Amino acid sequence: SNCSSLTNITVPDSVTVLDGLAFSYCTNLKNIELSKNLTEIGMGALSHCTSLETIDIPDSVIIMDNIAMAGCSELKSVNIGSNLKTVGGQVFAGCTSLEKVNVNLNNKNYTSENGIWYDKNKTKIILYPYNKKDSAYTTPTSLKELCNGYVGSYGILLDNSNLKTVTIEKNVAKIDDYAIGFVFDFDNYKINKVKDFTVKGYRGTVAESYAKKNSFNFVALDKTLQTPSISKLENTSGGIKISWNKVSGAYGYRVYQKTSNGWKRIKDTTATSYTDSAVSVNQTKTYT
């Protein structure tokens, strides 16, 4: 550690464990080729290598310990091998230039899509890169939660100031505090809210409640259905029969009657007609 003169190194294949802090604060290290037999990257082993821009995690690596690469501020891309299983806390904390994480397709524990690191079934995000350039993100339909990030820093899952809009699908059942719409200010060591942040989602879901709780813009994705038009009014032996056109996408209809106190709901139905039996001779009624 603290080898400021070190710029390039190849770790011999005889090395199976990279000890904690092994190359920490090697601030001029630009290239490192890890052992093909490496199984573990120890705590802080490659932390604060501030000149390192890319790294390949070999297929042999199973464990990346806490803060393994924290503070690698120029790191732009990470390639993760096929056998990584255990990932410690804040492994990439403070890697503020990181744009993409690519996971080997044969990895049974993790996957990646568009540079974002997920668990294998894409039910949760492992890491959304700090410096990914996209201004908008839509959660996969498989995603179940937006929980506080432990691989990144300080509990913020989508810690990216470029990100202004997140669209949340219906399957997301949980959003932790500060998970989205916030960024960590490393200079002043505090959490800031993203200006003009927008959450898109469905009414009555965690997306709407999270947006309202944090005073973010909320855009509802629920379909706006057409109001049915009354197609026929007729007198029948049972009363006045009201018929209307079927509206595509509607699962039911509500019939209202105008009263002296305003509109009164008189019927919920899945049919496209309703017969009002509460009528009398010379009576006028208004429906909608």
Spans of model-derived segments:
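Extracellular low-complexity, O-glycosylation-prone stalks/linkers
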Residues: 249-265
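Structural signature of tandem-repeat unit edges
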Residues: 3-17, 26-40, 49-63, 72-86, ...
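Hydrophobic core positions of the immunoglobulin-like beta-sandwich fold
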Residues: 244, 274-277
